[in-house]
Curated annotation (Swiss-Prot):
GO terms for cellular component: cytosol. This is Probable Fe(2+)-trafficking protein. It comes from Legionella pneumophila subsp. pneumophila (strain Philadelphia 1 / ATCC 33152 / DSM 7513). Keywords: Iron. The lineage of its organism: Bacteria, Pseudomonadati, Pseudomonadota, Gammaproteobacteria, Legionellales. InterPro entries: Fe_traffick_prot_YggX (IPR007457), Fe_traffick_prot_YggX_sf (IPR036766). Belongs to the Fe(2+)-trafficking protein family. Transmembrane segments: none annotated. GO terms for molecular function: iron ion binding. It comes from the Bacteria. NCBIfam families: PRK05408.1. Could be a mediator in iron transactions between iron acquisition and iron-requiring processes, such as synthesis and/or repair of Fe-S clusters in biosynthetic enzymes. One of its GO terms (biological process) is cellular response to oxidative stress. Signal peptide: none annotated.
């Protein structure tokens, strides 16, 4: 049986993640407050950020940027798309 959480992004009860996505306090918070659907939405947004900003995830500052954007996406004012970004349809 899957677990449910009150998702901070979707503002409703939804299926929760199966395991903590990464270690640490932020990982625990995501596990407890973010649904599987919202996590998948973040993964798509994160991929767009990596590609548009040409982030090199070997660099600590790129990983820190993504961590900050994730906090904004789920728990803050929201993560913005890069200026000039146009979605492919």
């Amino acid at each position: 049986m899957s677990r449910t959480v009150f998702c901070c992004k979707l503002k409703q009860e939804a299926e929760g993640l199966e395991k903590q996505p990464f270690p640490g306090e932020l990982g625990k918070k995501v596990f407890n407050e973010v649904s599987k659907q919202a996590w998948n939405m973040w993964l798509s947004h994160q991929t767009m950020l990596i590609n548009e900003y040409r982030l090199n995830l070997i660099e600590a500052r790129a990983r820190e940027f993504l961590k900050e954007e994730m906090q904004k996406y789920f728990f803050g004012e929201g993560s913005e798309k890069p200026s000039g970004y146009k979605e492919i349809k």
